[in-house]
A protein has these predicted regions:
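Catalytic cores of carbohydrate-active enzymes across secretory and cytosolic contexts
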Residues: 1-855
């Protein structure tokens, strides 16, 4: 076999248009599609052949074409405008972050994720987490937030999906050609490719560093596929979520530990805080602690407190299986030489990744590791925050589940990435000037009402026609490859109708997402879809993990249903779901169907992408829709009820779905005026855009992260670093508290048990607290009350701080009182408790210390 050396020959950009090269190497273009239109003008055919990849295009376009457009006045006018916009964007100091937090402009937020969905040309993502992470970086750039991203570069990317004639998913991995992408190697001081390493048992794993520019944000990716590694180690970063548990622990050591060292030791950055997304990067906590111990010469416990002030953890999963749990022997293999460097024992190390208790054989949980150390923790929707507090309540067994220190920041989308270009033009015309810079404000979206119905509907129909053309191409290719004749294929695709009510369902095919729920009652669905004069089309797309047999069975079943005579040409299953396909779907269907098994959807963002494009949501009240639904902006499936079995839940939800389709959605869609427009439909469509456009953008999401998590931690960690002695004192305070907490006694003073009073009255309650070995300034006493159920559970809890009225210093007894407001009728329960208090205590629940009154 011949071996060839590779030489890349690039056409030379004329000086007049040389900025095409710089902008092509910055993913700013992925949400500024005006730039991409320049390439269409240079050579439309080549642009399509290059799959709309500007870097690849500039390597293949002829020198003649470049010279020609560099003298084209019309082209140059547009080029100059776009170049100016790019320069202004990259160099502007007038950003949201700079204006609101000028004193924090030198801070750095390091954002870690195992996957990033930035653009279809860079397939290093698999699903929701990746798309969210990509959108997170883009909005951080828009808002001027000083953020840097860290991830892994998967040369195989995520798999390409084919669906054969039997409906079976086939997976295909292909190497990404990095030289055709806006990904560039980072250079060291000598101009060579930067290579770092991380320690593995008896060897080093070497990693090449790559960089992607995402507007003003830099994303660094680590790559083990280099000659310095053995063949096995070269595969560490080959596939996303591939391999066995040992491969996963290797990947997560690289992401977390090598990622920290890349930033701090090799790039000379000093991140103020670190943001972990899922438990994949949780090992970064250990590297941070190790570095603090070495730098500050402090104990493990003090270093852990400082690390807590530097870390945010976001959980994106609503189920225990969503967190990696590594066998103890595997953890020992990779960390037995590490925990001595932290100054702790094997048992102390292993317990960092376990819930409290004596069992050391339960496995090392990456989610628990992050929860135990991170100073701030959050879920990704209001409901998911509550689910997460319950899910991880045993990490803080003494704390009421509803008070576990896990908050929430509801996910959003990077609007300009997902907004159809024609809609963007329409919004530019009717919304306020500079709406894109202020999209997180609700008032911006009120102007949607001013868009004439016919103009909005016309754009929607245009998007729908484009989607139908794509469905025809995708289906034709899939069926042709499977041996279907031209006549058979044409019989199916010719039935696609832009006037038909079109419902879309596209997402990862996990079983809890219930992709086949709509077919629960095939006979009823047959009646619904074959109603003369009111046609319906269903379009499905999505991948199942290669190891998920049940998910693949769902795909197969949808294929089989789509080939039933009564559904042929009305149900379509598209293959190779990716960002490009998603853009067509979320802007081209009429209704976005989402029916996960509640409450197992952490957030879900596909419906947010749909709503900003005027596609109306039809969803279970789960994830973001549980807080986004307003009764006038879409439809719901089922209720908030809890069921004894999945079968009962599926039956109830499917019946609700059919009823809403028959009684609300279909009649509303087909109730047209003389211009062929449904006024009621347009009203719901506009309400959908107005109520979700700002609230569910990543612009709003990043504002929330910054205000609620990033800035408080940035300011706290700087205080910690400025006075390590205070941290040591705080650590000693905690140790003393743990030793003496059991001695606290609470006695109720005035007993109102089993009394009856009128609604609207207040009662004054009091208790005596005995503190044998704890200073009274180190605690807070609270009244804890709410409506009490027959089973003794108190709901709708209110917590009121109590006032210190009397002190008996000799006997260490203190008397507290407060008033309880009982505004509405019902049965109430109340009690008292003691909680720790310290100015350096970020979240009281983190200590897992609470003393309740006992008889």
């Amino acid at each position: 076999m011949y071996i060839f050396n590779r030489i890349t020959v690039n056409p030379q950009l004329p000086k007049r248009i040389e900025k095409l090269g710089e902008i092509s190497n910055n993913l700013w273009w992925s949400w500024n599609t005006e730039f991409l239109r320049l390439f269409q003008k240079i050579d439309m055919d080549l642009w399509e052949q290059c799959n709309k990849n500007p870097v690849k295009f500039l390597k293949q376009v002829s020198q003649e074409r470049l010279e020609k457009v560099s003298k084209d006045i019309s082209f140059l006018r547009e080029y100059d405008k776009i170049s100016e916009n790019f320069e202004n964007y990259m160099n502007s100091k007038n950003t949201w972050f700079f204006n609101k937090y000028p004193e924090n402009k030198k801070d750095i937020i390091a954002y870690f994720s195992a996957e990033y969905g930035l653009d279809e040309t860079i397939p290093i993502y698999s699903g929701g987490l990746g798309i969210l992470s990509g959108d997170h970086l883009k909005s951080a750039s828009d808002l001027g937030i000083p953020l840097v991203g860290v991830g892994l570069l998967y040369k195989n990317g995520y798999f390409h999906q084919k669906i054969n004639g039997y409906g079976q998913q086939e997976t295909e991995y292909t190497n990404i050609d990095l030289y055709d992408l806006p990904i560039n190697p980072v250079k060291d001081d000598k101009g060579d490719d930067l290579t770092i390493y991380v320690k593995f048992p008896k060897r080093r794993l070497y990693l090449k560093v790559w960089q992607i520019n995402v507007g003003r944000v830099k994303l660094y990716l680590l790559d083990s596929d280099i000659p310095k590694n053995n063949e096995e180690d070269r595969d560490v970063t080959l596939k996303l979520y591939g391999g066995d548990q040992e491969m996963r622990i290797r990947q997560e050591i690289v992401l977390g530990m090598a990622g920290v060292n890349l930033l701090t030791k090799y790039l000379g950055l000093k991140p103020t805080i670190y943001h972990m997304n899922e438990g994949h990067s949780s090992f970064l906590n250990l590297e941070i602690i190790k570095n603090i111990i070495k730098e500050k010469q402090v104990s493990f416990e003090v270093a852990k407190d400082i690390a807590s002030s530097k870390t945010v953890f976001t959980t994106h999963t609503p189920v225990p299986a969503g967190n990696d749990i590594f066998p103890i022997d595997l953890v020992e293999k990779y960390f037995k030489d590490f925990w001595p460097r932290l100054g702790i024992s094997r048992e102390e190390f292993l317990k960092l990744g376990m819930k409290p208790g004596p069992d050391l054989d339960s496995g090392f949980n990456m989610g628990i590791l992050a929860l135990k150390i991170a100073g701030k923790k959050n879920g990704v929707s209001k409901l998911h925050g509550a689910v997460s507090r319950e899910l991880f309540s045993d990490v803080w067994p003494n704390i009421a589940a509803n008070e576990s220190p896990i908050g929430y920041v509801t996910n959003g989308i990077h609007t300009c990435t997902w907004l159809a270009p024609k809609l963007k033009e329409l919004y530019n015309k009717y919304l306020i000037p500079y709406w894109q810079d202020n999209m997180h404000h609700d008032y911006v979206w009120e102007k949607i009402k001013n868009i004439p119905d016919d103009k909005l509907w016309s754009v929607h129909i245009d998007r729908k026609r484009k989607l139908i053309n794509l469905v025809k191409e995708n289906t034709t290719e899939r069926l042709r490859r499977s041996g279907y004749s031209y006549e058979e294929i044409n019989e199916i695709v010719s039935k696609l109708n832009p006037d038909a009510l079109t419902i879309g369902f596209s997402r990862r095919f996990a079983t809890y997402k219930r992709a086949t729920l709509i077919f629960k009652d095939i006979e009823r669905m047959t009646q619904i879809m074959n109603n003369l004069g009111k046609p319906i089309q269903l379009i499905f797309a999505g991948k199942a993990h290669p190891a998920d047999k049940e998910g693949q069975d769902l795909i197969k079943y949808i294929h089989e249903v789509s080939m039933m005579p009564q559904f042929k040409g009305k149900i379509f299953l598209l293959e190779n779901y990716n960002i490009a396909l998603s853009r067509y779907l979320v802007s081209g269907v009429d209704v976005w169907l989402n029916n996960p098994r509640r409450p197992m959807e952490a957030s879900g963002t596909s419906g947010q992408k749909a709503s900003v494009n005027g596609v109306i949501n039809f969803s279970v009240l789960d994830g973001w829709w549980a807080e986004g639904y307003t009764q006038t902006n879409g439809w719901t499936i089922g209720t908030n009820a809890e069921y004894d079995s999945y079968e009962a839940q599926d039956m109830a939800d499917s019946q609700s779905m059919y009823h809403t389709l028959e009684e609300k959605i279909i009649p509303t869609y087909y109730d047209r005026d003389k211009n062929g427009i449904s006024k009621k439909w347009m009203e719901i469509m506009k309400n959908s855009i107005i109520t979700t456009g700002g609230k569910y953008s990543t612009a709003r999401m990043l504002v929330d992260y910054t205000n609620q998590l990033y800035i408080p931690l940035c300011n706290l960690t700087k205080k910690y670093y400025e006075n390590i002695d205070n941290v040591a004192s705080y650590n000693a305070w905690k140790k003393e508290l743990f030793e003496n907490w059991k001695d606290i006694k609470i006695t109720q003073e005035n007993n109102f048990d089993n009394i009856t009073i009128d609604a609207g009255n207040n009662i004054e309650v009091g208790c005596e607290v005995e503190l044998p070995n704890i200073d009274v300034d180190n605690i807070t006493v609270e009244a804890y009350y709410g409506k009490i159920l027959d089973n003794g559970v108190v709901e709708n809890v209110s917590i009121t701080p109590m006032k210190l009225e009397e002190s008996d210093e000799e006997h260490k007894k203190y008397y507290y009182t407060t008033k309880i407001e009982l505004t509405t009728g019902g049965n109430y329960g109340y009690t008292f408790r003691v909680m720790p208090k310290h100015e350096m205590l970020l979240e009281p629940a983190n200590l897992n210390l609470v003393k309740w009154i006992t008889k």
